[in-house]
C-alpha cells in the first residue's frame, strides 16, 4: 500500500500534479521563514529545553529536519498535538516508537488544560537536574506552521496566569486557521525559583521539501497553505489515501442503516455547522444545523463506501485509481449539496471535503506509517528527524 501511494505521487497522478523540472517549482518556503529560522537557531542555543510540537496525524512528516541536529543536542520533548484528531491505537504505537528511541514523547490536546498540565509536569521532570543550580531557565516551543504551537502557548499562559496573578505577562499568542500566524519570538514567565520562561516561535518549514508525499501530507494537515498546492490536488491525494487503505469499506454500517461503527460518534454527534468547522470551539449551532451536518457527513461517507465497494478496478493500477477518484468527486458534489452547474464546483467540493477531514468529522486518522524495518529505525540516516 505504501509503495503504491508513493509511486502514484511520484508519477504526478494526484490531481494532475506535475513535478517535472519544466513544470515549475512549488515554493513551500515564504521569505519571512528564512529570517525566522535564523532567529530560532539563535534562541535554541540559549534554551535549556525544547518542546517540539508536531501534528499527531503526521508525527514524522511534521518534523522540521533542518533544526533536528540542533534540537537533538538539547533536552527535548516531542509533543504530538491534536491527538483528538488522530487514531488512538496508531498514536500509541508512535509514542512507543519514540520512547524506544530514548526520545521523550507525549500526545496532547493543546486546548485541554489537563493535557497541557501533563506536558508541564514532564517539562519540570526533565529540568529537575538543572533547577537547583540555574537561576533562570528557558523553554522554547518550536514546530512547523499550524501544528498548534500558539494554542499550546495560550494554554500554558492561562496556567501561568493562575499561578502568578500579579505578574506582568505578555498578551496571549494569536491563534488562526492559517499557517504562519505567529511571526515573532516572544515569551513569558511560568515559574519562580528558578525563573522559567517559555519562548514561542513562528512556524517554519525547511527551505526545500524533497519528498513530494511529505509535502502533500503537510498540505493536507494544513501546515502548508492550500493556495501553494491547490485544494483540488490535496483533496485528490486524500482520496487516494482513503482508497488505497480501503478506509471507506469500514463505513459499511451507514449503508446498512446500523447506528454503530468505528466513527459513529463523529457522525451522529457533529458539533459544528460546515461553515464554522474551520473555527473549532465556537458557539454551538442549533439542533437543525446539527442534523443537517450530521446527515451531510453520513452521506459523504456512504457515497465513498458505495463507490469503492462497487469499484471493479484495481486501486493499485494508476489509471483505475484515477478513474475512481474522478467518480468520487462527482458523488461528493451531490453529497455536499453543491449545485451541479456551479462554477468552480470541484474547488468547492475540495474545500468542504478537506474541512471535514481537518476537523475530524470523517473520523480519526494518522497519515504517517510507524517505521517497522531496520532502515526506518530512528538511529538510521532517515531518522535524523526524530
Swiss-Prot record:
Annotated Gene Ontology cellular component terms: chloroplast; mitochondrion
Name of this protein: Short integuments 2, mitochondrial
Limits of the CP-type G domain: 37-207
Effect of inactivating the gene: No visible phenotype when heterozygous, but completely female sterile when homozygous.
Region (G5): 109-111
Organism per entry: Arabidopsis thaliana
A Pfam family assignment: MMR_HSR1
Listed CDD domains: YlqF
Positions that bind GTP: 81-84, 109-110, 146-151, 203
Family note: Belongs to the TRAFAC class YlqF/YawG GTPase family. MTG1 subfamily.
Stated consequence of mutating residue 150 to F: In sin2-1; loss of function
Domain notes: In contrast to other GTP-binding proteins, this family is characterized by a circular permutation of the GTPase motifs described by a G4-G1-G3 pattern. The DARXP motif is also sometime designated as G6 region.
InterPro entries from the UniProt entry: G_CP_dom, GTP-bd, GTP-bd_ortho_bundle_sf, P-loop_NTPase
Domain of life: Eukaryota
Region (G2): 180-184
Alphabetized UniProt keyword annotations: GTP-binding, Hydrolase, Mitochondrion, Nucleotide-binding, Transit peptide
Amino acid at each position: 500500500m505504501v509503495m503504491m501511494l508513493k509511486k502514484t505521487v511520484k508519477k504526478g497522478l494526484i490531481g494532475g500534479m506535475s513535478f517535472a523540472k519544466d513544470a515549475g517549482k512549488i515554493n513551500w518556503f515564504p521569505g519571512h521563514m528564512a529570517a525566522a529560522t535564523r532567529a530560532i537557531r539563535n534562541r535554541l542555543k540559549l534554551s535549556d529545553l525544547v518542546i517540539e510540537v508536531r501534528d499527531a496525524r503526521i508525527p514524522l512528516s511534521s518534523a522540521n529536519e533542518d533544526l533536528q541536529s540542533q534540537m537533538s543536542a538539547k533536552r527535548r520533548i516531542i509533543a504530538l498535538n491534536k491527538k483528538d484528531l488522530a487514531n488512538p491505537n496508531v498514536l500509541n504505537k508512535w509514542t512507543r516508537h519514540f520512547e524506544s528511541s530514548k526520545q521523550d514523547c507525549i500526545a496532547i490536546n493543546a486546548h485541554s488544560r489537563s493535557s497541557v498540565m501533563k506536558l508541564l509536569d514532564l517539562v519540570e521532570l526533565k529540568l529537575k537536574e538543572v533547577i537547583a543550580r540555574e537561576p533562570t531557565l528557558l523553554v522554547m516551543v518550536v514546530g512547523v506552521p499550524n501544528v498548534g504551537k500558539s494554542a499550546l502557548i495560550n494554554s500554558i499562559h492561562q496556567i501561568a496566569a493562575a499561578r502568578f496573578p500579579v505578574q506582568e505577562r505578555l498578551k496571549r499568542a494569536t491563534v488562526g486557521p492559517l499557517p504562519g500566524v505567529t511571526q515573532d519570538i516572544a515569551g513569558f514567565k511560568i515559574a519562580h525559583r528558578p525563573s522559567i520562561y517559555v519562548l514561542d516561535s513562528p512556524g517554519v518549514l525547511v527551505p526545500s521539501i524533497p519528498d513530494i508525499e511529505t509535502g502533500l501530507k503537510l498540505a493536507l494537515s494544513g501546515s502548508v497553505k492550500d493556495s501553494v498546492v491547490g485544494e483540488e490536488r490535496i483533496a485528490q491525494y486524500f482520496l487516494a489515501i482513503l482508497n488505497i487503505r480501503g478506509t471507506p469499506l469500514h463505513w459499511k454500517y451507514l449503508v446498512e442503516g446500523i447506528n454503530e461503527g468505528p466513527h459513529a460518534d463523529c457522525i451522529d454527534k457533529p458539533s459544528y455547522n460546515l461553515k464554522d468547522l474551520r473555527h473549532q470551539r465556537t458557539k454551538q449551532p442549533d439542533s437543525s444545523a446539527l442534523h443537517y451536518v450530521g446527515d451531510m457527513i453520513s452521506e459523504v461517507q456512504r457515497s465513498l463506501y458505495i463507490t469503492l465497494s462497487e469499484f471493479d478496478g484495481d486501486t493499485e493500477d494508476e489509471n483505475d485509481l484515477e478513474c475512481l477518484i474522478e467518480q468520487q468527486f462527482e458523488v461528493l458534489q451531490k453529497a455536499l449539496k453543491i449545485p451541479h452547474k456551479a462554477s468552480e464546483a470541484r474547488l468547492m467540493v475540495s474545500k468542504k471535503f478537506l474541512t471535514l477531514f481537518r476537523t475530524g468529522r470523517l473520523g480519526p486518522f494518522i497519515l504517517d506509517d510507524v517505521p517497522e524495518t531496520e532502515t526506518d529505525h530512528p538511529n538510521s540516516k532517515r531518522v535524523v528527524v526524530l
